[in-house]
Amino acid sequence: VLMEDVPGVGKTTLAVAFSKALGLETKRIQFTPDTVASDITGYTAFDRQAQGFTFHSGAAMTNILLADEINRTSGKTQSALLEVMEERACTVDGRTYPLPEPFAVIATQNPTGTVGTAALPVSQLDRFMIKLSMGYPDKAAMRSIMSDGSSSDPLADVKAVCTAEKLIEMQKKAKAVFVDDSVYDYISDLCDATRHNENISLGVSPRGALALCRIAKAWACYKGREYVVPQDVRDFFAHVCSHRISLSAKGRLSGLAAESVLDEILKSVKCPENEEKRR
């Protein structure tokens, strides 16, 4: 999960609250210009007592890795996350160490252009299943934040409502959700449309299509259904794909946002008949 927004809107607070609610082992790493790859993956050091090299695990050896302000470090350090996010493992000095199950990365970043930030590599962005934006709170929410936040810790009352075993069980249940061929074709058509749009220079990859399918299955499971309907795909199309596409020169000069281009694609691609109606 990648959360992007301006500083001060609660990205890190939400990430910490989410990890506490899951009740899983969590490690947090604050990305800075001097953060190195070994801070993430770990390192080996000679142990004089054991007369051998010992592996010291990094921040990635956990269930939930909170990567705060991920776009404030170097590209070399970012590359250490590629294997971690894709293969759920880290390789140190030629030896591969599997990460605990379940595993997820929750990252926060400020918009590119903010002082001290740099754009994440495309290969890394593509590994995030979904990108969310907090946005500014409305007047009522702002009043609640000021009245409650000034007197107590907003995270103090967050309790664990899940366990690793329960989460793995829910993941298996979501994977078993049925997807009709028409919905598979719909996802494929949507992603293909991003590759043939004059306002987009880089479209959604096959990995992105898989992510859209998986999150649609999870959403259907959450809704209490054993099958995916086209609306499940539409609900998350922009969230799954906005960080995976790159606008062309024409799109940028026109002042378009990735979300608006994706919204036009949603309107232009024919949606299959609702599966619920056919049942």
Mark where each language-model region is:
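Conserved alpha-helical scaffold flanking the Walker A/P-loop in AAA+ ATPase domains
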Residues: 46-67
